[in-house]
Amino acid sequence: MGRAMVARLGLGLLLLALLLPTQIYSSETTTGTSSNSSQSTSNSGLAPNPTNATTKAAGGALQSTASLFVVSLSLLHLYS
């Protein structure tokens, strides 16, 4: 009974780790585009680079996914 509960907890954490970064990515890109549209046109020398924003969001999402995956594996190893 204990192993089944730990397995469910681990799978739940893994599912959360897979779904949470997509929500973080979508909220970061939404706020990034809204702040870019409100900028004045006087700063024409510096154009925003959407590639960097996407890379940073994907990197953060990957890091949080990897962290939660390691935590779930550690819990499974500890309680198995």
From Swiss-Prot:
Effect noted on mutating A57V: Probable risk factor for multiple sclerosis; homozygous patients express higher levels of CD24 on peripheral blood T-cells than homozygous controls
Entry GO terms, CC: cell surface; external side of plasma membrane; intracellular membrane-bounded organelle; membrane; membrane raft
Inducing stimuli: Expression is lost when primary B-cells are induced to differentiate in antibody-forming cells.
Record bears the keyword rRNA processing: no
Membrane disposition: Lipid-anchor; GPI-anchor
Keywords recorded for this protein, A-Z: Cell membrane, Glycoprotein, GPI-anchor, Lipoprotein, Membrane, Signal
Glycosylation sites: N36, N52
PTMs per UniProt: Extensively O-glycosylated.
Keyword Cell division part of the UniProt annotation: no
Tissue note: B-cells. Expressed in a number of B-cell lines including P32/ISH and Namalwa. Expressed in erythroleukemia cell and small cell lung carcinoma cell lines. Also expressed on the surface of T-cells.
Propeptide residue intervals: 60-80
Record localization: Cell membrane
A Pfam family: CD24
Positions where lipid (GPI-anchor amidated glycine) attaches: G59
Molecular function GO terms recorded: protein kinase binding; protein tyrosine kinase activator activity
Main localization (coarse): membrane
Any one GO BP annotation for this protein: negative regulation of transforming growth factor beta3 production
Residue span of region Disordered: 28-58
The family this protein is said to belong to: Belongs to the CD24 family.
Protein task: May have a pivotal role in cell differentiation of different cell types. Signaling could be triggered by the binding of a lectin-like ligand to the CD24 carbohydrates, and transduced by the release of second messengers derived from the GPI-anchor. Modulates B-cell activation responses. Promotes AG-dependent proliferation of B-cells, and prevents their terminal differentiation into antibody-forming cells. In association with SIGLEC10 may be involved in the selective suppression of the immune response to danger-associated molecular patterns (DAMPs) such as HMGB1, HSP70 and HSP90.
Subunit organization: Interacts with LYN and FGR in a cell-type specific manner.
PANTHER family, sorted: SIGNAL TRANSDUCER CD24 (PTHR16676:SF0)
Protein name, as recorded: Signal transducer CD24
Organism for this UniProt entry: Homo sapiens
